[in-house]
Design a protein with these regions (language model features):
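Alpha-helical repeat scaffolds in large eukaryotic proteins
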Residues: 46-60, 162, 236
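Acidic, Ser/Thr/Gly/Pro-rich intrinsically disordered interaction regions
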Residues: 1-43, 91-288
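Long acidic/polar interaction regions in large eukaryotic complex-forming proteins
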Residues: 65-100, 105-106, 113
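Short, solvent-exposed secondary-structure capping/transition elements
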Residues: 51-69, 170-175
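Nuclease catalytic cores
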Residues: 38-42, 46, 50-53, 74
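Short alpha-helical "patches" and their helix-cap loops
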Residues: 64-75, 250-260
Length: 288
């Protein structure tokens, strides 16, 4: 989708060839191509966060007891999504600290941190994996803590995610905001909102309508989706070797391990737009 976004002219040319025609008049379908691709990128980012946390909680030890890594599919299928959403919310607001990733557990005849077990399983032996590697893993886990906190915060904005899941709730709305001097009516500040999406929230009890507008940040959405994918890769790929039959089939197979550091995650986490969230509300007031 990121490639499509940088080649919207080519995308539009393909769409033009397949546009509907009624009584000799073509119905244009390319007006919102860029909007649709960016909305899909945003939605895909939310899906990748949700997928990451499903694996994360499934593999997570419970009171020091490590789950059966060979039968993790059962845990995923029987996942309690409402409890997981609550855990994500707790990570986002700080009630659930990520320091537990530093706690030590016994696993495969090694004493390792939960973070090491989750993201670098099977690379515990100090004879096979030298001290430099072990230090890199510790630093990587510190970066992973920041990533998890960030994606939990992004995901905890449930109203936005729900709007994307029910696509009819997301729509282009405002083109710009202009702030004027109250006395002279001269423009002081203006913000371009042409590249944004809006969604509505209704508070029936308060008889209030809220329109939330968020500028698209496709570069960040793409990079953060890639980070989520790499975290999932680390959790799943090594386990397919440690607990699967790949080791017997491909004894000399080389596997890429992804180590994270503060520098490369900061570039992905940063926002690339000046305004991130705007809210407009209107409330029905009863006349006294």
């Amino acid at each position: 989708m990121n490639n499509l976004l940088s080649n919207t002219d080519k995308v539009n040319s393909v769409i033009n060839e397949n546009e509907l025609e009624y009584q000799g008049v073509k119905i244009p379908l390319t007006k919102n191509t860029k909007f649709i691709i960016q909305a899909d990128l945003r939605q895909n980012y939310f899906h990748s966060i949700e997928s990451f946390f499903e694996f994360f909680f499934a593999f997570l030890p419970n009171k020091g007891k490590v789950p059966d890594n060979r039968n993790i599919l059962r845990a995923l299928v029987k996942s309690n999504w409402s409890k997981n959403y609550k855990k994500i919310e707790y990570i986002a607001n700080g009630k659930m600290k990520l320091n537990f990733l530093d706690e030590m557990i016994d696993f495969l005849d090694h004493k390792v941190s939960i973070g090491h077990y989750l993201f670098y399983v099977g690379t515990f032996s100090k004879e096979k994996f030298n001290e430099e590697y072990q230090d890199s893993v510790k630093k990587s886990i510190e970066s992973i803590k920041k990533i998890i906190k960030t994606i939990a915060t992004d995901f905890s904005k449930r109203d936005e995610y729900n709007a994307y899941k029910h696509t009819m709730r997301v729509f282009p709305s405002f083109n710009s905001i202009h702030i004027l001097d109250a006395n002279t009516m001269e423009e002081q500040i203006n913000f371009d909102l042409s590249n944004s999406a809006s969604y509505q929230i209704y508070n029936d009890k308060e008889k209030e309508t809220i329109v939330k507008t968020k500028l698209f940040d496709p570069e960040r959405d793409f990079k953060m989706t890639r980070i989520c994918s790499r975290l999932i890769y680390n959790m799943v790929e090594l386990r397919s070797i440690v607990f699967g039959d790949r080791k017997e089939k491909n004894g000399n197979e080389k596997v890429a391990l992804i180590l994270f550091n503060q520098e490369n995650i900061e570039d992905s986490i940063k926002h690339n737009v000046k305004i991130q969230d705007l809210s407009f509300s209107s409330k029905l007031i009863k006349r006294q």
